[in-house]
Swiss-Prot record:
It comes from Methanopyrus kandleri (strain AV19 / DSM 6324 / JCM 9639 / NBRC 100938). It comes from the Archaea. NCBIfam families: PRK04165.1 (NF003195). GO terms for biological process: acetyl-CoA catabolic process; methylation. It is an enzyme of class 2 (transferase). Keywords: 4Fe-4S, Cobalt, Iron, Iron-sulfur, Metal-binding, Methyltransferase, Transferase. This is Acetyl-CoA decarbonylase/synthase complex subunit gamma. SUPFAM superfamilies: Dihydropteroate synthetase-like (SSF51717). Residues 1-60 form the 4Fe-4S domain. Its cofactor is corrinoid; [4Fe-4S] cluster. The gene is cdhE. Its EC number is 2.1.1.245. Binds 1 [4Fe-4S] cluster.
């Protein structure tokens, strides 16, 4: 796919420089459109024909589509590069977790509630699961409809996937929940029937084949009814699961970017079969975690898992958080003074940088240990401690500047700063610039609570 330029977009704009879109000029707006920082609809002066042409020009090679409606809506796809540094990856892959219609009703309700309530806070962001996938194992439309009903009742904002190969069972599920659930899997045997159901219900349809090449005829047939498709090239299980599956996903992404129309759709990966392929549930969860984490790195647009074990899900969600961070945006927090707990005039004063990960690690470790302290965050341009020391951003003047701006001297009765262990080289510079006594802290923020207690800093006397 040829790289789109701002001039390509500018030629379709009204060139009025009216500012109605929030940009001073149409060229600025064109640049934002190319960088996906604005939408064509933001320009009120575009006529219908120009808007349609612009939307077509800006459409990414991997189609962007939604699953669910309202609070249950998630967006998948929308990517246009092989490597994140070329632009960015968009729309983190939602993680669905399965329930089954052969489970007892209270088991379905309990697991759905676990899925709904699961959350972990990491570096200031809450990581959650995104959907519940209801799988038919009985082939009984009534039992399946009841399972869907329970899953929907016990979830508040989870997207829903309906998983069955039987069109009659799928129809029973749709009778209970029709708010744009994902229908899966459409195979060679049932693609026409499921595609019709998807078209009638305005639902996205997941296509399943055993290999990449076998997806093409499925796509061609499904496109006669709907264009909201997801592609499952056949998740592999066993010794070579990671390599084989990620190779397939990479092949589809590369073909999509090269504008092979049949592969211009989001990809779908299912790891939940490991729950039935492994006798040991711990081993099954571990295999799921390995495979799902690898597929997040290699172009999976949606994951359907079985496990709700936090230790198995956390690597997947952490991987997703890291990979789908926009590399074009500096990862930094606002410099200044932060209160940790309920500090007073005798509480210790610690210094760190405004790199997001550094700040949240330090603040999180202090908060989890119930430490009351003041945290001075200096402006290093979003760089970590060791990098900013080496690059000259972590200096005595930088610390002095934030001390003066925050009036910390009026808030504490002592003059003792604790700097990171990796900033030991600037101890003298900080003391000379600020006039404060400087103590060299720990290399790792997890050791700070013990260090503060050992050094007697939890209650500093003047």
């Amino acid at each position: 796919m040829a790289q789109l330029s701002a001039m390509d977009v500018y030629n379709l704009l009204p060139k009025a420089n009216c500012g109605a879109c929030g940009c001073k000029t149409c060229m600025e707006f064109a640049t934002k459109l190319v960088n996906r920082e604005a939408k064509p609809e933001d320009c009120p002066k575009l006529d219908d024909e120009s808007l349609e042409k612009l939307q077509e020009l800006l459409a990414p090679p991997v189609k962007e589509l939604t699953i669910g409606e309202g609070d249950r809506e998630v967006t998948v796809g929308g990517d246009e590069v092989m490597f994140r540094h070329e632009l960015s990856f968009f729309n983190p892959p939602p993680v669905f977790v399965t329930v089954y219609d052969d489970m007892e009703e209270d088991e379905i309700a309990g697991k759905t509630e676990e899925i709904q309530e699961f959350q972990v806070e990491r570096v200031g962001e809450v990581l959650k699961l995104d959907g519940v996938a209801v799988v038919s194992r009985t082939g009984d439309p009534e039992k399946y409809a009841r399972a869907v009903e329970i899953a929907v009742e016990r979830s508040e904002d989870l997207a829903v996937a309906l998983i069955t190969t039987d069109p009659k069972v799928m129809e029973a599920g749709l009778d209970v929940f029709d708010e744009r659930p994902l229908l899966y899997p459409a195979t060679e045997e049932n693609v026409e029937d499921l595609a019709k159901l998807a078209a009638d219900g305005d639902c996205p349809l997941g296509l399943h084949a055993r290999d990449v090449e076998d997806l093409v005829p499925l796509v061609v047939e499904a496109q006669q009814y709907t264009d909201d498709l997801l592609l499952d090239p056949g998740t592999e299980f066993g010794p070579h699961d990671v390599v084989s599956t990620t190779d397939k996903l990479a092949e589809i992404r590369k073909a999509a970017i090269e504008e092979f129309e049949s592969f211009g759709y989001p990809t779908l990966v299912t790891t939940f079969p490991y729950a039935f392929l492994e006798d040991d549930p711990v081993k099954a969860a571990r295999r799921e975690s390995y495979l799902a984490s690898a597929c997040v790195l290699r172009y999976a647009d949606i994951l359907i898992m079985d496990t709700v074990e936090p230790w198995a899900l956390l690597p997947v969600l952490t991987q997703r958080q890291c990979v789908y961070t926009d590399p074009r945006e500096p990862q930094e927090v606002e410099p200044g003074l932060y209160r940790i707990g309920d500090p007073d005039e005798n509480s210790p004063v610690l210094v760190t940088t405004n790199f997001t990960l550094t700040y949240h690690c330090v603040a999180g470790d202090l908060e989890s240990a119930d430490i009351d302290c003041w945290l001075l965050v200096i402006d290093t341009g979003g760089l970590a401690v060791d990098v900013s020391v080496a690059g000259g951003q972590f200096t005595g003047e930088a610390v002095k500047e934030v001390i003066e701006e925050t009036d910390i001297e009026d808030k504490v009765e002592h003059r003792v700063l604790v700097i990171p262990g990796k900033a030991a080289a600037v101890k003298g510079d900080v003391e000379d610039a600020t006039g404060w006594d400087v103590m060299i802290g720990t290399q790792d923020s997890s050791e700070l609570p013990e260090f503060l207690e050992k050094e007697g800093l939890l209650r500093i006397e003047e």
